[in-house]
UniProtKB/Swiss-Prot annotation:
Gene3D superfamilies recorded: 1.10.287.310
Matching Pfam families: Ribosomal_L29
Full protein name: Large ribosomal subunit protein uL29
Organism the protein comes from: Acinetobacter baumannii (strain AB0057)
MF terms (GO), sorted A to Z: structural constituent of ribosome
Record NCBIfam families: L29 (TIGR00012)
Length: 65
């Protein structure tokens, strides 16, 4: 997901998206560990998306200064 798209979301939407992405990352890691994941780069993409969301949450909550 692009940062531009994430910036348009509210704090509540970002928190919900963060929960969803963390669950997705967990599922991807389990699939990778059991050898069922065909596209191993998806784990890295999920991790970077989570980092983007956390960064934007920090900025929007006023702690980024």
């Amino acid at each position: 997901m692009k940062t531009k798209d994430l910036r348009e979301k509210s704090v509540e939407e970002l928190k919900a998206l963060l929960d969803e992405q963390q669950l997705n990352q967990f599922r991807l890691r389990m699939a990778k560990a059991t050898g069922q994941l065909g596209k191993s780069h998806e784990v890295q993409v999920a991790r970077k998306t989570i980092a983007r969301i956390k960064t934007l949450l920090t900025e929007k909550q006023g702690n980024g200064q």
